[in-house]
Protein backbone atom coordinates (compact mmCIF):
# COMPACT_ATOMS: atom_id res chain seq x y z
CA UNK A 1 0.00 0.00 0.00
CA UNK A 2 2.89 2.36 0.70
CA UNK A 3 3.45 2.85 -3.02
CA UNK A 4 0.05 4.48 -3.57
CA UNK A 5 0.66 7.80 -5.38
CA UNK A 6 -1.63 9.81 -3.10
CA UNK A 7 0.21 13.11 -3.11
CA UNK A 8 1.70 15.01 -0.18
CA UNK A 9 1.09 13.81 3.36
CA UNK A 10 1.98 16.68 5.68
CA UNK A 11 0.15 17.45 8.92
CA UNK A 12 -3.13 15.97 10.09
CA UNK A 13 -4.76 19.37 9.69
CA UNK A 14 -5.03 20.63 6.15
CA UNK A 15 -4.12 24.31 5.76
CA UNK A 16 -7.32 26.32 6.12
CA UNK A 17 -6.50 28.68 3.28
CA UNK A 18 -5.08 27.85 -0.14
CA UNK A 19 -4.63 30.80 -2.47
CA UNK A 20 -4.73 28.58 -5.54
CA UNK A 21 -8.10 27.09 -4.50
CA UNK A 22 -10.40 28.87 -6.90
CA UNK A 23 -11.55 31.99 -5.14
CA UNK A 24 -10.14 31.19 -1.71
CA UNK A 25 -9.87 34.91 -1.18
CA UNK A 26 -11.88 36.97 -3.60
CA UNK A 27 -9.95 39.77 -5.25
CA UNK A 28 -10.93 43.18 -3.97
CA UNK A 29 -9.70 46.40 -5.56
CA UNK A 30 -9.86 48.51 -2.41
CA UNK A 31 -10.34 47.32 1.15
CA UNK A 32 -12.06 50.47 2.43
CA UNK A 33 -14.71 50.35 -0.30
CA UNK A 34 -16.57 47.56 1.51
CA UNK A 35 -19.25 49.63 3.23
CA UNK A 36 -20.49 46.72 5.30
CA UNK A 37 -17.11 46.60 6.99
CA UNK A 38 -16.92 50.29 7.77
CA UNK A 39 -15.82 49.71 11.37
CA UNK A 40 -12.85 51.82 12.31
CA UNK A 41 -9.42 50.25 11.96
CA UNK A 42 -8.09 49.81 15.48
CA UNK A 43 -4.42 50.51 16.03
CA UNK A 44 -2.01 48.95 18.48
CA UNK A 45 -3.64 45.55 18.81
CA UNK A 46 -0.54 43.45 19.51
CA UNK A 47 -1.52 42.13 22.94
CA UNK A 48 -4.51 39.89 23.54
CA UNK A 49 -5.27 39.10 27.20
CA UNK A 50 -6.44 42.21 29.04
CA UNK A 51 -6.46 44.32 25.90
CA UNK A 52 -9.50 46.55 25.35
CA UNK A 53 -10.71 46.94 21.77
CA UNK A 54 -13.24 49.64 20.90
CA UNK A 55 -14.98 49.73 17.54
CA UNK A 56 -17.97 51.42 15.93
CA UNK A 57 -20.89 49.56 14.40
CA UNK A 58 -24.06 50.73 12.66
CA UNK A 59 -24.37 54.05 10.85
CA UNK A 60 -25.95 52.49 7.74
CA UNK A 61 -29.42 53.34 6.43
CA UNK A 62 -29.85 56.09 8.98
CA UNK A 63 -29.03 53.85 11.96
CA UNK A 64 -27.19 55.57 14.80
CA UNK A 65 -23.52 54.69 15.19
CA UNK A 66 -22.70 52.71 18.28
CA UNK A 67 -19.37 52.19 20.04
CA UNK A 68 -18.71 48.71 21.38
CA UNK A 69 -15.73 47.80 23.56
CA UNK A 70 -14.37 44.33 24.16
CA UNK A 71 -12.03 43.19 26.92
CA UNK A 72 -9.93 40.26 25.68
CA UNK A 73 -9.96 37.57 28.39
CA UNK A 74 -8.18 34.43 27.19
CA UNK A 75 -7.00 32.64 24.06
CA UNK A 76 -9.25 29.64 23.32
CA UNK A 77 -7.74 28.49 20.01
CA UNK A 78 -4.71 28.97 17.80
CA UNK A 79 -3.73 27.76 14.35
CA UNK A 80 -2.10 28.71 11.08
CA UNK A 81 -5.08 31.07 10.53
CA UNK A 82 -4.40 33.21 13.63
CA UNK A 83 -6.05 33.06 17.07
CA UNK A 84 -9.50 32.84 18.65
CA UNK A 85 -9.97 34.56 21.99
CA UNK A 86 -12.82 34.92 24.43
CA UNK A 87 -13.78 38.52 25.16
CA UNK A 88 -16.42 40.37 27.14
CA UNK A 89 -18.48 43.24 25.78
CA UNK A 90 -18.01 46.02 28.35
CA UNK A 91 -21.35 47.65 27.47
CA UNK A 92 -23.53 44.52 27.86
CA UNK A 93 -21.39 42.01 29.80
CA UNK A 94 -21.96 39.48 27.02
CA UNK A 95 -19.21 36.96 26.27
CA UNK A 96 -18.12 36.64 22.64
CA UNK A 97 -15.49 34.74 20.67
CA UNK A 98 -13.27 36.85 18.40
CA UNK A 99 -11.36 35.15 15.60
CA UNK A 100 -8.42 37.29 14.56
CA UNK A 101 -6.91 36.47 11.15
CA UNK A 102 -4.19 38.15 9.13
CA UNK A 103 -5.86 39.94 6.23
CA UNK A 104 -4.31 40.40 2.79
CA UNK A 105 -5.26 43.96 1.78
CA UNK A 106 -5.82 42.86 -1.85
CA UNK A 107 -8.59 40.34 -1.12
CA UNK A 108 -11.92 39.81 0.56
CA UNK A 109 -11.98 37.17 3.28
CA UNK A 110 -14.07 34.21 2.13
CA UNK A 111 -14.95 33.03 5.65
CA UNK A 112 -16.56 36.42 6.32
CA UNK A 113 -18.49 36.40 3.04
CA UNK A 114 -19.87 32.90 3.76
CA UNK A 115 -20.77 33.55 7.40
CA UNK A 116 -22.59 36.85 6.89
CA UNK A 117 -25.92 35.50 5.62
CA UNK A 118 -25.97 32.37 7.82
CA UNK A 119 -28.75 32.18 10.39
CA UNK A 120 -29.49 28.80 11.97
CA UNK A 121 -29.71 27.37 15.52
CA UNK A 122 -26.97 24.83 14.73
CA UNK A 123 -24.51 27.19 13.03
CA UNK A 124 -22.34 29.70 14.89
CA UNK A 125 -23.58 33.24 14.30
CA UNK A 126 -21.43 36.18 13.23
CA UNK A 127 -22.30 39.30 15.22
CA UNK A 128 -20.08 41.76 13.37
CA UNK A 129 -16.48 42.31 12.30
CA UNK A 130 -13.77 44.95 12.37
CA UNK A 131 -10.18 45.46 11.26
CA UNK A 132 -7.20 46.07 13.50
CA UNK A 133 -3.55 46.85 12.84
CA UNK A 134 -0.35 46.09 14.72
CA UNK A 135 2.76 48.17 15.26
CA UNK A 136 4.26 46.33 12.25
CA UNK A 137 1.42 47.66 10.07
CA UNK A 138 -0.12 44.20 9.67
CA UNK A 139 -3.86 44.25 9.02
CA UNK A 140 -6.08 41.79 10.90
CA UNK A 141 -9.73 40.94 10.38
CA UNK A 142 -11.61 40.28 13.62
CA UNK A 143 -14.76 38.14 13.37
CA UNK A 144 -16.97 38.64 16.44
CA UNK A 145 -19.11 35.55 17.08
CA UNK A 146 -21.33 34.19 19.81
CA UNK A 147 -19.34 32.40 22.51
CA UNK A 148 -20.11 28.72 23.17
CA UNK A 149 -17.98 27.30 26.01
CA UNK A 150 -17.43 23.65 25.04
CA UNK A 151 -16.45 21.55 22.03
CA UNK A 152 -17.65 18.05 21.21
CA UNK A 153 -13.99 16.99 21.36
CA UNK A 154 -13.72 18.04 25.03
CA UNK A 155 -17.15 16.61 25.91
CA UNK A 156 -16.14 13.21 24.49
CA UNK A 157 -12.77 13.39 26.26
CA UNK A 158 -14.64 13.99 29.55
CA UNK A 159 -16.20 10.53 29.15
CA UNK A 160 -13.21 8.65 27.74
CA UNK A 161 -10.82 10.00 30.40
CA UNK A 162 -12.89 8.17 33.03
CA UNK A 163 -13.34 5.03 30.88
CA UNK A 164 -17.00 5.80 30.20
CA UNK A 165 -18.98 5.79 26.99
CA UNK A 166 -21.01 8.81 26.02
CA UNK A 167 -24.68 8.01 26.85
CA UNK A 168 -26.47 7.02 23.66
CA UNK A 169 -29.08 9.75 24.22
CA UNK A 170 -26.39 12.43 23.92
CA UNK A 171 -24.91 10.71 20.85
CA UNK A 172 -28.35 11.03 19.25
CA UNK A 173 -28.89 14.61 20.39
CA UNK A 174 -25.46 15.85 19.27
CA UNK A 175 -25.27 14.06 15.92
CA UNK A 176 -28.84 15.02 14.99
CA UNK A 177 -27.92 18.68 15.44
CA UNK A 178 -24.72 18.22 13.41
CA UNK A 179 -26.79 16.93 10.48
CA UNK A 180 -29.35 19.70 10.93
CA UNK A 181 -26.59 22.32 10.71
CA UNK A 182 -25.13 20.59 7.64
CA UNK A 183 -28.58 20.37 6.01
CA UNK A 184 -28.85 24.14 6.37
CA UNK A 185 -25.41 25.10 5.03
CA UNK A 186 -25.59 22.57 2.17
CA UNK A 187 -28.99 23.74 0.91
CA UNK A 188 -29.55 27.39 1.84
CA UNK A 189 -26.20 29.15 1.27
CA UNK A 190 -24.94 26.05 -0.63
CA UNK A 191 -21.74 25.84 1.40
CA UNK A 192 -19.52 22.80 1.99
CA UNK A 193 -17.77 23.08 5.38
CA UNK A 194 -14.76 20.87 4.45
CA UNK A 195 -13.48 20.48 8.03
CA UNK A 196 -16.18 18.77 10.10
CA UNK A 197 -14.59 17.27 13.23
CA UNK A 198 -15.30 17.24 17.00
CA UNK A 199 -13.07 20.29 17.56
CA UNK A 200 -15.27 22.34 15.18
CA UNK A 201 -18.54 21.40 16.86
CA UNK A 202 -19.43 23.63 19.80
CA UNK A 203 -21.65 22.44 22.66
CA UNK A 204 -23.53 24.52 25.20
CA UNK A 205 -23.17 22.44 28.41
CA UNK A 206 -26.49 23.73 29.84
CA UNK A 207 -28.84 23.46 26.85
CA UNK A 208 -26.83 20.82 24.90
CA UNK A 209 -27.30 22.86 21.74
CA UNK A 210 -24.63 22.08 19.11
CA UNK A 211 -23.24 24.63 16.67
CA UNK A 212 -21.04 24.09 13.64
CA UNK A 213 -18.12 26.54 13.70
CA UNK A 214 -14.89 27.48 11.86
CA UNK A 215 -15.71 28.23 8.24
CA UNK A 216 -12.05 28.91 7.41
CA UNK A 217 -11.96 25.96 4.99
CA UNK A 218 -15.54 26.29 3.74
CA UNK A 219 -16.45 26.97 0.14
CA UNK A 220 -19.42 27.13 -2.22
CA UNK A 221 -18.75 24.15 -4.51
CA UNK A 222 -19.63 24.85 -8.14
CA UNK A 223 -20.15 21.85 -10.44
CA UNK A 224 -17.36 21.65 -13.01
CA UNK A 225 -15.00 23.91 -11.06
CA UNK A 226 -11.98 22.22 -9.44
CA UNK A 227 -11.22 22.40 -5.72
CA UNK A 228 -8.18 21.40 -3.71
CA UNK A 229 -8.24 17.80 -2.51
CA UNK A 230 -5.85 18.36 0.41
CA UNK A 231 -8.58 19.61 2.72
CA UNK A 232 -10.24 18.38 5.93
CA UNK A 233 -8.50 16.95 9.00
CA UNK A 234 -7.11 13.50 8.31
CA UNK A 235 -9.23 11.21 10.52
CA UNK A 236 -12.40 12.74 9.02
CA UNK A 237 -11.21 13.01 5.40
CA UNK A 238 -13.48 11.37 2.81
CA UNK A 239 -11.79 8.68 0.65
CA UNK A 240 -12.32 10.64 -2.59
CA UNK A 241 -10.12 13.39 -1.12
CA UNK A 242 -7.41 10.85 -0.31
CA UNK A 243 -7.70 9.71 -3.95
CA UNK A 244 -6.99 13.29 -5.04
CA UNK A 245 -10.47 14.12 -6.38
CA UNK A 246 -10.95 17.80 -7.23
CA UNK A 247 -14.61 17.73 -8.32
CA UNK A 248 -16.11 16.47 -5.08
CA UNK A 249 -19.44 17.42 -3.50
CA UNK A 250 -20.81 18.35 -0.08
CA UNK A 251 -21.01 14.60 0.62
CA UNK A 252 -17.43 14.92 1.95
CA UNK A 253 -19.07 16.60 4.98
CA UNK A 254 -21.44 13.63 5.32
CA UNK A 255 -18.46 11.25 5.48
CA UNK A 256 -16.84 13.46 8.13
CA UNK A 257 -20.07 13.54 10.16
CA UNK A 258 -20.24 9.74 9.89
CA UNK A 259 -16.73 9.57 11.33
CA UNK A 260 -17.83 11.85 14.20
CA UNK A 261 -20.87 9.63 14.88
CA UNK A 262 -18.66 6.51 14.96
CA UNK A 263 -16.18 8.27 17.28
CA UNK A 264 -18.93 9.18 19.75
CA UNK A 265 -20.15 5.57 19.71
CA UNK A 266 -16.65 4.06 20.04
CA UNK A 267 -14.98 6.66 22.26
CA UNK A 268 -12.08 6.92 19.79
CA UNK A 269 -11.58 7.75 16.07
CA UNK A 270 -12.80 5.02 13.71
CA UNK A 271 -10.06 5.66 11.11
CA UNK A 272 -6.92 6.84 12.99
CA UNK A 273 -4.50 7.01 10.03
CA UNK A 274 -0.95 8.25 10.63
CA UNK A 275 -0.66 9.73 7.12
CA UNK A 276 -2.75 9.89 3.95
CA UNK A 277 -1.82 6.40 2.75
CA UNK A 278 -2.35 4.90 6.20
CA UNK A 279 -5.69 6.72 6.37
CA UNK A 280 -6.85 4.80 3.30
CA UNK A 281 -5.55 1.56 4.84
CA UNK A 282 -7.63 2.21 7.98
CA UNK A 283 -10.74 2.79 5.85
CA UNK A 284 -10.12 -0.37 3.76
CA UNK A 285 -9.72 -2.42 6.97
CA UNK A 286 -13.36 -1.58 7.81
CA UNK A 287 -15.07 -1.07 4.43
CA UNK A 288 -12.97 -3.58 2.49
CA UNK A 289 -11.24 -2.91 -0.83
CA UNK A 290 -13.31 -0.55 -2.99
CA UNK A 291 -14.72 -2.04 -6.20
CA UNK A 292 -13.71 -0.64 -9.59
CA UNK A 293 -17.06 1.16 -9.75
CA UNK A 294 -16.56 2.70 -6.29
CA UNK A 295 -13.06 3.83 -7.28
CA UNK A 296 -14.48 5.35 -10.47
CA UNK A 297 -17.03 7.28 -8.38
CA UNK A 298 -14.23 8.65 -6.18
CA UNK A 299 -11.61 9.38 -8.86
CA UNK A 300 -11.74 7.85 -12.39
CA UNK A 301 -7.94 8.11 -12.72
CA UNK A 302 -7.44 5.27 -10.23
CA UNK A 303 -9.61 2.54 -11.80
CA UNK A 304 -6.63 0.59 -13.18
CA UNK A 305 -4.64 0.76 -9.95
CA UNK A 306 -4.35 -2.65 -8.27
CA UNK A 307 -5.31 -2.75 -4.60
CA UNK A 308 -4.81 -5.70 -2.27
CA UNK A 309 -8.14 -7.50 -1.87
CA UNK A 310 -9.41 -7.13 1.70
CA UNK A 311 -12.88 -8.19 2.82
CA UNK A 312 -15.12 -5.71 4.59
CA UNK A 313 -15.31 -6.00 8.38
CA UNK A 314 -19.00 -6.47 9.34
CA UNK A 315 -20.36 -3.23 10.82
CA UNK A 316 -21.89 -5.01 13.82
CA UNK A 317 -18.39 -6.22 14.74
CA UNK A 318 -16.94 -2.70 14.50
CA UNK A 319 -19.09 -1.61 17.46
CA UNK A 320 -19.75 -3.33 20.79
CA UNK A 321 -22.51 -5.95 21.10
CA UNK A 322 -25.08 -3.75 22.84
CA UNK A 323 -24.94 -1.03 20.17
CA UNK A 324 -28.45 -0.13 18.90
CA UNK A 325 -28.88 -1.56 15.37
CA UNK A 326 -30.21 1.84 14.19
CA UNK A 327 -26.86 3.44 15.11
CA UNK A 328 -24.97 0.82 13.08
CA UNK A 329 -27.36 1.23 10.15
CA UNK A 330 -26.92 5.02 10.10
CA UNK A 331 -23.11 4.75 10.25
CA UNK A 332 -23.16 2.31 7.32
CA UNK A 333 -25.28 4.72 5.23
CA UNK A 334 -22.92 7.63 5.90
CA UNK A 335 -19.60 5.83 5.43
CA UNK A 336 -19.99 4.67 1.82
CA UNK A 337 -17.16 4.82 -0.72
CA UNK A 338 -19.45 6.16 -3.46
CA UNK A 339 -20.22 9.81 -2.59
CA UNK A 340 -23.64 9.67 -4.28
CA UNK A 341 -24.71 6.68 -2.15
CA UNK A 342 -24.20 8.52 1.15
CA UNK A 343 -27.46 9.83 2.53
CA UNK A 344 -27.98 13.60 2.58
CA UNK A 345 -27.90 15.56 5.83
CA UNK A 346 -31.72 15.88 5.85
CA UNK A 347 -32.13 12.15 5.19
CA UNK A 348 -29.78 11.49 8.11
CA UNK A 349 -31.96 13.68 10.37
CA UNK A 350 -34.99 11.56 9.44
CA UNK A 351 -33.22 8.27 10.27
CA UNK A 352 -34.90 6.01 12.89
CA UNK A 353 -31.79 6.35 15.11
CA UNK A 354 -33.16 9.78 16.07
CA UNK A 355 -36.78 8.68 16.69
CA UNK A 356 -36.34 9.02 20.46
CA UNK A 357 -35.81 12.77 19.99
CA UNK A 358 -39.15 13.00 18.15
CA UNK A 359 -41.19 11.52 21.02
CA UNK A 360 -43.76 14.00 22.47
CA UNK A 361 -42.33 13.67 25.99
CA UNK A 362 -38.64 13.78 24.98
CA UNK A 363 -36.57 15.74 27.51
CA UNK A 364 -32.96 16.09 28.57
CA UNK A 365 -31.96 13.53 31.25
CA UNK A 366 -32.23 16.30 33.88
CA UNK A 367 -35.85 16.98 32.87
CA UNK A 368 -35.15 20.23 31.04
CA UNK A 369 -36.52 20.77 27.51
CA UNK A 370 -34.48 19.76 24.47
CA UNK A 371 -32.76 22.48 22.42
CA UNK A 372 -34.65 23.50 19.24
CA UNK A 373 -34.71 20.50 16.88
CA UNK A 374 -37.68 20.89 14.55
CA UNK A 375 -37.88 24.59 13.62
CA UNK A 376 -36.93 23.88 10.00
CA UNK A 377 -37.28 26.69 7.48
CA UNK A 378 -35.59 27.16 4.10
CA UNK A 379 -33.63 23.89 4.26
CA UNK A 380 -36.86 21.97 3.58
CA UNK A 381 -37.25 23.72 0.20
CA UNK A 382 -36.39 20.72 -1.98
CA UNK A 383 -37.59 17.99 0.41
CA UNK A 384 -40.44 15.62 -0.43
CA UNK A 385 -43.60 15.62 1.71
CA UNK A 386 -42.74 12.07 2.78
CA UNK A 387 -39.35 13.25 4.10
CA UNK A 388 -40.86 16.34 5.77
CA UNK A 389 -43.43 14.14 7.55
CA UNK A 390 -40.62 11.94 8.87
CA UNK A 391 -38.59 14.98 9.96
CA UNK A 392 -41.29 16.89 11.83
CA UNK A 393 -43.11 14.84 14.50
CA UNK A 394 -46.90 14.85 14.51
CA UNK A 395 -47.10 16.59 17.90
CA UNK A 396 -44.93 19.44 16.51
CA UNK A 397 -47.05 19.67 13.34
CA UNK A 398 -50.18 19.95 15.52
CA UNK A 399 -48.59 22.75 17.56
CA UNK A 400 -47.61 24.54 14.35
CA UNK A 401 -51.12 24.31 12.87
CA UNK A 402 -52.66 25.47 16.18
CA UNK A 403 -50.28 28.42 16.23
CA UNK A 404 -51.23 29.34 12.66
CA UNK A 405 -54.95 29.18 13.49
CA UNK A 406 -54.51 31.35 16.58
CA UNK A 407 -52.55 33.94 14.60
Curated annotation (Swiss-Prot):
Catalytic class of the enzyme: transferase
Keyword tags: Acetylation, ATP-binding, Kinase, Nucleotide-binding, Phosphoprotein, Serine/threonine-protein kinase, Transferase
Catalytic reaction equation(s): L-seryl-[protein] + ATP = O-phospho-L-seryl-[protein] + ADP + H(+); L-threonyl-[protein] + ATP = O-phospho-L-threonyl-[protein] + ADP + H(+)
Entry keyword annotation includes Kinase: yes
Annotated region described as Disordered, given as residue ranges: 1-23
Post-translational modification: Autophosphorylated mainly on threonine and serine residues.
SMART domains: S_TKc (SM00220)
Gene Ontology molecular function, alphabetical: ATP binding; protein serine kinase activity; protein serine/threonine kinase activity
Modified residues (Phosphotyrosine): 230
Origin: domain of life: Eukaryota
Chain positions found as N-acetylalanine: 2
Function recorded in the entry: Phosphorylates BSK1, BSK3, BSK5, BSK6, BSK8 and BSK11 in vitro. May mediate extracellular signals to regulate transcription in differentiating cells.
Complexes and interactors: Binds to KIB1. Interacts with BSK6.
Protein name: Shaggy-related protein kinase iota
Source organism of this protein record: Arabidopsis thaliana (Mouse-ear cress)
Name of the gene encoding the protein in the UniProt record: ASK9
